[in-house]
Structure formats: structure tokens, C-alpha cells
Amino acid sequence: MGVSIEPASPVIPSKDPRPLQSGLGIAYMAGGMFLFAAVDTMAKFLTETLHPLQVVWSRQLGLLLGVFILLAIKGTSVLATKNKKLQITRGGLAACSATLFIVAVSYVPLADAVAVSFVAPFIVTMLGAFVLREPVGIRRWIAVTIGFVGTLIVIRPGMGVIHPAVMLVLVAAICFALRQVVSRYLAGSDRTETTVAYTALVGSFILTIPLPFIWQWPTPGPVVVVLLVMAPCAALAELLVIKSLEVSQAVVVAPVQYSLLIWGTMYGYLVFGHLPDFWTWIGALIIVSTGVYTLHRERVVTRRRKAETQDA
């Protein structure tokens, strides 16, 4: 989300990565988060002169170009799927979450929006429990509850501290979480490249529909330069995150995603002069701490299940 804090598709990481690969995976993930924060900053800058939908569409071009190259190399077999409806649904959710986030950051400081977007993993945990019937222990439920408290501290609803558009980030997080749940279904049946292709094609198609009604020709200058740079940066960020999960365990590199808040704060200050206030930092610290703890508990539970399976 910010625009996306996870890869565009479910990727099954190496089962037994070498120690050096774990370090490389962390480096890839850190690089991806650095670029994602840069892309979010570019998007916020562009919304000052262009319609948010046009900005999201322009960002999508990088991923779409990559898919066209993939289709040229491997042919239409890339689009072979066992569940087209779910693939289309996932593409729609991806477009929705990205659009809502970009609209939100046109009003809300980048660091605040990124902090709130990290509520998505907690929503994924809840959906996993209620939709996928995944067992969730009491400690993870407590972590989820505390994480939501942290989100409320950042937003402070009814106090007029943050622009109401921050609620769009919450809706974007819900869309993102739903997308991740769909990804879990698709991971067992479709290839990663298939999911990436459908996400890019469906998302681009949806975002193109309103384009004739909101299109604005950018004036020559910084806006054009940023438009040209944003799409390749977004595509490279996606690639780095995917490579990270290919060469290392997801549980090793996932906490690095929270560095997005650091980069978002840095860019927000350097470009827009925005700095989070004291309570935003407190809320963000709570969200990140409980998020990392949730990842730790998932790792413990996964190891326990593997041990039980091997003993059986």
C-alpha cells in the first residue's frame, strides 16, 4: 500500500535458504521499501497538479510494461489460471487499495498514512481466523487489539487532529487485507507470474475506464520528469520485494517492511516539510511493535505445526 507493503503476488520463498541469502533478502526488502516510499512521495507530489486516478494509472504502467515483456517471452500461457474470478477479484482489490491510498495522501502527511496502513496485517489475521478458519491464539488476538489501539492513537477520531481522508487509508488497508486472503487461495493453484499478470492487467483496465473524464496533460517540467520516473521505480520496488521472498524466509524479511515508515517520514520531511507529532509516533511505535510480535508468533506457530507433522 504505501502503495503496497507486500509483493504484488504470493511468493513461496526458498525452504532452506543459505545464511548469505537471508542477508541478501533483507537487503532486497530494504531497497524495495526505500523505493516504495519514494514512489508514494512522487505520487503525493503529483496529486498537487493531477487527478489521483491519473497518478495511480501512471504508477501502474511500470508493472504493466513488465507483464507485456513477460507475455512476449512466455506467451499467453502465463494467463492460464484455475480460478479466473479470484484473479480478477484480486486485481480489482489491488486497484482499489492503491487508489484509496493515493487519494488519502493527497490530503494526509505521508508518514501518518503509512503508519495507519500498517493495520493491514492485523486485518489479515482477523480474516484468516474468520474466513479461512485459521487458528489464532490468545496472544495474537491481544496483539491485534493493541495494534488497533495504536491505530486509533494515530487517527484520534473526532479530535480534528488529522484530515478525515485518513479513513480512506483504513478502507485501503481492508482492501489490501482482502487481497492477501485471496492470494492465499491462489497460491496453491496458480503460478506467481500468473497472479502478477492478472493483477496488472485487471488493475490497469479498471483504472483506464475513468481516464478520459479526468485526464490532464501535464505541463513540461518537474511533473513530467516525476511521471516518467515513478512507474519504473514502482516496478523495480515490486521486483526487489519479490526477489527478497525468493531468496529468504518470509519471516526473516517481513519485519523489514516496517522501514517504510522511516523512509516515508524522511521523504515527507525533506519534500513537504511534514513531521509526525508526538502521539503519531507513539501510535506508530505500538503498531510496529505489535506487528513484529504478530510475525514472531506466526513463525513460532508454523514451526510447531511442522514439528507435529514430522512427528506424526
Where in this protein do the model-derived segments appear?
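Transmembrane alpha-helices of multi-pass small-molecule transport proteins
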Residues: 2-12, 24-25, 49-96, 175-178, ...
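Structural signature of hydrophobic alpha-helical transmembrane segments
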Residues: 51-63, 102-120, 162-175, 220-235, ...
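Helix-helix packing/entry segments at the starts of transmembrane helices
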Residues: 114-119, 186-202, 238-269
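C-terminal transmembrane-helix exit sites in multi-pass transporters
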Residues: 120-142, 262-281
